Amino acid sequence: MATVKEKLMTPLTAGIKVPNNKISIVGVGQVGMASAISILGKGLCDELALVDVMEDRLKGEMMDLQHGSLFPHTHKIVADKDYAVTANSKIVVVTAGVRQQEGESRLNLVQRNVNVFKFIIPQIVKYSPNCTILVVSNPVDILTYVTWKLSGLPKHRVIGSGCNLDTARFRYLMSERLGIHPDSCHGWILGEHGDSSVAVWSGVNVAGVPLKELNPAMGTDKDSENWKEVHKQVVDSAYEVIKLKGYTNWAIGLSVANLCETILKDLYRVHSVSTLFKGMYGIENDVFLSLPSVLSAAGLTSVINPKLKDDEVAQLKKSAETLWNIQKDLQDL
């Protein structure tokens, strides 16, 4: 006896089994799920896969998203602890990792994350050898280096979310002072995603007008308007949000979706993301830091070479040295 489906439809051909724009997210914590909902909201993928070791949480998050399938334009939402579910991904977003314990050194934290990544990264590459990996887990610059080493992928296909969010925070805070939209404020945060990031005051402009020409002291201790405070707010913002609500997730989730959109739609937009820095600005170690970079469907296709002041270069070198002093002591890479 024919089923309702058989009575309803006459099949003409089999559907396409391989997704065109699949995104997988490793880790369904606060950041992973904020990334998922931001990606779904933009309608970026035809399949979204979630992976985590916490099976009940994973199934619950999958079901919760599936129940809203009427609203976004993503046809298929799947989840499993087995990485086979990520097969044929265009982008794999890594948000998984261990949290820092009270009194724990940064080196020890990174080493514990290395041990986690030693399982995760080979599984990603096994099932999606042609994917671009977007690392979001912190400390993101070092873990992007770890991912690059463990994956065997070319450097243009291993990208850290880096200072994309720092730059967004910077532009938002500038826009609040100037009373205009963040889109109309042009400025960049480079270097480490974190305390030693570098605000490139020499390049800050609105409508092509360099703000340094209007206020030569901008970004220095001599500035009566104290624009330097804007960068301090960028650095402190994550700590402040964590103090207030326990974690950050929405802004980084939106940042991840922004990066995925540029890659999947082959937009060739410029983002401040973490990439291999060796050979630039006199840095000779294998460190990943953020530079303005062109992203496309091929991954990170070009790096912009900003004209930096001597003090800005010195700050980048200091960032690189800080990261290398941790990386050089990592085991089993």
Curated annotation (Swiss-Prot):
**Enzyme Commission number(s) of this protein:** 1.1.1.27
**Keyword Ribonucleoprotein belongs to the record:** no
Gene Ontology cellular component list: cytoplasm
Tell me the pathway: Fermentation; pyruvate fermentation to lactate; (S)-lactate from pyruvate: step 1/1
UniProt xrefs under Pfam families? Ldh_1_C (PF02866), Ldh_1_N (PF00056)
Which GO annotations describe the biological process of this protein?
lactate metabolic process
Residues that, per the record, bind substrate: 106, 138, 169, 248
Q: Which residues bind NAD(+)?
A: 29-57, 99, 138
Q: Name one GO molecular function term.
A: L-lactate dehydrogenase activity
Mitochondrion as a keyword of this entry, yes or no, is no
Annotated localization: Cytoplasm
The active site of this protein is located at 193
What is catalyzed by this enzyme? Answer: (S)-lactate + NAD(+) = pyruvate + NADH + H(+)
The family this protein is said to belong to: Belongs to the LDH/MDH superfamily. LDH family.
**Subunit comment for this entry?**
Homotetramer.
> What function does this protein fulfil?
Interconverts simultaneously and stereospecifically pyruvate and lactate with concomitant interconversion of NADH and NAD(+).
Under what name is this protein listed?
Answer: L-lactate dehydrogenase B chain
Q: Which organism is it from?
A: Columba livia
